[in-house]
């Protein structure tokens, strides 16, 4: 299990190649911080993530899966998890709910689209 790990590692490819030799099945949780909203908002999410949580690399669903596939992992299953809704469930602040209504509506049309526009998701990947 590598949950929220390889975005912190300087040489992601080297790390993942070594990891691949250590087992048969792998479960990854990868934060997806690149979105349309993250590119246009005034607050620099990339600087914030680097300074506060130490992320050296940033991913979309596609780039995360390509990274794993390029190393030689076979993707068995993947699922998008909306971290913002989980955060709202914890603190239940009204402004948090209101801000997330457009994302919630768009998610009903498709998680991939909502993730690409709003961000705030993680990708859970089962690989071999």
Positions of the model-derived regions?
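Conserved SAM-binding loop
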Residues: 1-40, 58-68, 73, 119-128
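Acceptor/aglycone-binding surface of glycosyltransferases and processive sugar-polymer synthases
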Residues: 37-43, 49-50
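A C-terminal cap/extension of S-adenosyl-L-methionine-dependent methyltransferases
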Residues: 41-45, 77-128
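Short linear sequence motifs
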Residues: 51-52, 66, 97, 114
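Acceptor-substrate binding/catalytic loop of class I
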Residues: 46-63
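Glycine-rich loops and low-complexity Gly/Arg-rich segments
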Residues: 25-27, 50-55, 99-105
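A near-ubiquitous, low-amplitude feature marking generic local secondary-structure context
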Residues: 2, 47-51, 109-110
């Amino acid at each position: 299990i590598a949950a929220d790990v390889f975005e912190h590692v300087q040489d992601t490819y080297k790390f993942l190649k070594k990891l691949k030799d250590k087992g048969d099945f792998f479960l990854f949780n990868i934060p997806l911080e690149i979105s349309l909203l993250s590119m246009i908002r005034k607050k620099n999410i990339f600087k914030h993530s680097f300074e506060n949580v130490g992320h050296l690399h940033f991913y979309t669903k596609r780039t995360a899966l390509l990274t794993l596939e390029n190393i030689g992992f076979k993707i068995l299953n993947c699922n998008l998890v909306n971290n913002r809704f989980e955060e709202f469930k914890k603190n239940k602040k009204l402004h948090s709910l209101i801000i997330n209504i457009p994302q919630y509506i768009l998610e009903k049309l498709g998680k991939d689209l909502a993730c690409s526009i709003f961000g705030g998701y993680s990708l859970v990947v089962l690989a071999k």
